[in-house]
Amino acid sequence: QAETATEEHRAELEERIRRGEVGSVLMSVGATAGNTPQGEIGVDYYNHLQRIAVEESPQGIPLLFGRDVIHGHRTVYPIPLAMAAAFDPAAVRDCYREIAGEAANDSVHWSFAPMLDLSRDPRWGRIIEGGGEDPYVGAQMARAVVEGFRGDGTDRAGSVLACAKHFVGYGAAEGGRDYTHAEISDYALYNFYFPAFRAAIRAGAKTVMSAFNDINGEPVSASETCLTGHLRGHLGFDGMVVSDYGAVHQLIRNGVAEDDRAAAALALNAGIDMDMVDFCYLDEGEAAVREGRISMETVDRAVRRVLRVKAAKGLFAHPYCERRPVDYAAHRMSARRMAEKSAVLLKNSGRLLPLRKDAKILLIGRGAEARAELHGSWALDGDASATPDFCLAMQEKLSGGGFLRYDRDCESTLTGADAVVFALCEDPYSTGENACISDITISDYERSILRRAKALGKPLVGVFFYGRPIAMQGIAEWFDAILYAWHGGCEVAHAAADILFGDVNPSGRTPVTFPRLATHLPLY
C-alpha cells in the first residue's frame, strides 16, 4: 500500500501504479493523520489514479483506496467512546451507514475503523477511538460499526469496507504509552480482548489491521501465533490482514529483524497480507523468495486474500467513483441526536438542571468558543468553521427576558446571574495516536477560572467537551452540576444546550470508569 503523494512526488506514485507495484493507496499522509493537517480528498485525482491502474498497468487490477474515517467524514459525529456512552448499537449502526455514504462519495473504499482495542487507561490517547473498558460493550460497538459501514452490501454504492483494528492488545500498552510493551495472559486474551474482534468478524469485517505492539515479548506483526493461530484459527477470520503504518519495517526496531528483507519474511509468513506504506514487501519480497525465506505458496495466498477483498467490494465491476447526492443536513441532525444520546449527566445537586430559559446566565471558559476542539481527533474532513460554538447554542435557547454574558476568563462581577456555566474543552491533539498524557485532570489555567467562578457564590454548571475521562477529585465537588458532553462532533454544542435547558433528557452512561485520581489507574 502506497501513501497519497505530496505534490512533488505525484509523478513517482503514478509511475509505481503504472508499473503495477501498488495495489492500494492510503488517502492521507503520515502515521498520525488524525492529529496532522491533511489535504482535501479529490475524486477526480483518485479516479485518475484508478484509471492508470486499470488501463495502463500490466495486471489491470483496480486500486483499493483507504482512509481513516473514524467517527465521521464531512459530517463529524461524536468520537467512538462517546457513541459507546449512548448504549444504543442501532443508533451507532445508523450513524456509520451515513458516514459510509459520505466517504464512498469521495472515493473511499475502505475505512481503518472500528478500533476494537479494549482500553482501561485514559492516559492512552487512543482510548477515544474505542468502545471503552467492557468487552461486551466493545463487541456491540464492533458489530454496529461493521454493519453500518457495510449497509446493504459490501459491493453496493455507499458502502465502505471496515477494518477491525488493532489485532491484538494495542490498548493494553504499559502506562498508557503508545506503541509500548503489553503483558497479556491467555485468559485475558480470550475473555477480554478477542470478543470485539469475534463480533466484527461475524458481522462481516473483511479486513483486520495488525497491532504495533508486542505481547509478552513477541511483536504482533511477526507473530504467527496471533495472526494465524488466534485470528484465523480460533476466531475464524478468512479475510485480508494489513499491517499498521510502517509496522513491518518497525520489526527492525523491535529487535527481531536485522533488515527490511528479514522483516518482510517475518511479517508475510506470520500472516500479514498487505504491507502499509513502508514498501518492505515490494523492495525485498522477491529477494526473500529467491533465498527461500518466503514460499511462493505464501505469496499466492496473500495475493488471493487481497484480490478477494477487492472483488467483494465490487471494484472489478465498478472501479471508479461516481458521485451521488448526499443529504448532509439530515446527517447533521443524526450527529446531533447521537451527541444528545452520548452526553452523560455526572452530577445534578439540588436539581439545578434544567436551567430556565428566562435565566440570566454567565458563560465562562474557552470551551464556549471552541469549534475544532468539539470535533476531537481523527476528524480529517470535517469543516470546523461550519460547527456552531457553545456560546451561540446557549444564546439561541434563551427567551422571555433571559440573557447570556460570555466572559472567557471569568473576570466578571456579574452578581445578578442566576447561574454560571463553565465550558471546558480538551485539545484534540492531546488525544489520538501518539498523544498520551500523564496528567488526566484539568489545567492550572482552568483551575484558576474555576476558583473565580466559585467565588461568585452562584450555582455552577460544568460542561466538559473532553475526549478521555478525567480524574475528578478536586474538581467534581466544586460544581453543582456536571454534563460530560465529550468531543461530541459538529452538533455537540446544540446537543449540550438542549440538555442544559431541558429540551432533551440526558441518557448517556459512562462506558469507562472515571478515576478520582490518576494514581488509581488502571481502574475498571
Where in this protein do the model-derived segments appear?
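Glycoside hydrolase catalytic-domain context in secreted enzymes
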Residues: Q1-Y524
